[in-house]
Amino acid sequence: MAGNTIGQLFRVTTFGESHGLALGCIVDGVPPGILLTEADLQHDLDRRRPGTSRYTTQRREPDQVKILSGVFEGVTTGTSIGLLIENTDQRSQDYSAIKDVFRPGHADYTYEQKYGLRDYRGGGRSSARETAMRVAAGAIAKKYLAEKFGIEIRGCLTQMGDIPLEIKDWSLVEQNPFFCPDPDKIDALDELMRALKKEGDSIGAKVTVVASGVPAGLGEPVFDRLDADIAHALMSINAVKGVEIGDGFDVVALRGSQNRDEITKDGFQSNHAGGILGGISSGQQIIAHMALKPTSSITVPGRTINRFGEEVEMITKGRHDPCVGIRAVPIAEAMLAIVLMDHLLRQRAQNADVKTDIPRW
């Protein structure tokens, strides 16, 4: 009921708030015998970590993860893995002025309507700080998928504001602060971010995540279709307002003769479906996109009300990302990895003995 857990066989439960003592999660369903250290998780956490560039929030959290359980002598035991990250750079005083004010565009109003109270410090549980634990759990899934099945999961920024980005060079993604795969657009992104900082405003973004090497057959029709669970996972990320699989909404303008992915003896001739047909993976690349809204934490004055119903004007103080899509890349990778690992374990549990003579590419 509380909505803090995702997955069925590979289950991730997170806890913690933005300005609490710590963030944590419990990861169930990890097979025994996997080599696992804190360093295996730290790489992706460092990619998501705040304060790593001038384009993201200057809250400086080391995000050093601790493995509390489920690993003995560097090997998973098959029991629950407990993970913890301590919060070290909270500045709760930045939020004392808004404890009775609902920030427009944030979850303040809805959390108070639901629970009758809220942790106003940095958004509490609704803060994207919670996603650090998703990234830690997702790193376990990414390691297992890569080592046992050769599955690779990569994400990148594919649009910021009105600047579209082409996936020209995956190796470039880790070499610039925008997770940008398009060398021709990095200067334009830098210029846009500088302008936003000067204006005190923010901008939306689009993130694309791709999984390669996924075997055919993952997905549980009808309600646990693979694309449905991917959409569920990506939509659960803060600020995400839309998810597309494959060509997504672009299929509206296509005809069936254009959209169908024809098959020859050499394999699929296109991938408009994004690697999923009938809710089941086809063996092609799984491609998903998500749209993230511009954060409402800006210094441009805006109208709202306080808890007494009085209209007030407010400016959001604190340290915030002018484009939340940048740090969402490793989060999207983690959520896709969590879903794929869960479905892979479910497929093996039910259909491990299934053999077909149908070609696979």
Swiss-Prot record:
One of its GO terms (cellular component) is cytosol. Its EC number is 4.2.3.5. GO terms for biological process: amino acid biosynthetic process; aromatic amino acid family biosynthetic process; chorismate biosynthetic process. GO terms for molecular function: chorismate synthase activity; FMN binding. The keyword DNA-binding does not apply. Pathway: Metabolic intermediate biosynthesis; chorismate biosynthesis; chorismate from D-erythrose 4-phosphate and phosphoenolpyruvate: step 7/7. Reduced FMN (FMNH(2)). Pfam families: Chorismate_synt (PF01264). The keyword Translocase does not apply. Keywords: Amino-acid biosynthesis, Aromatic amino acid biosynthesis, FAD, Flavoprotein, FMN, Lyase, NADP. FMN binds at residues 125-127, 238-239, 278, 293-297, 319. It catalyses: 5-O-(1-carboxyvinyl)-3-phosphoshikimate = chorismate + phosphate. Its cofactor is FMNH2. NADP(+) binds at residues 48, 54. It is an enzyme of class 4 (lyase). It comes from the Bacteria. Signal peptide: none annotated. Belongs to the chorismate synthase family. This reaction introduces a second double bond into the aromatic ring system. Homotetramer. PANTHER family: CHORISMATE SYNTHASE. This is Chorismate synthase. The gene is aroC.
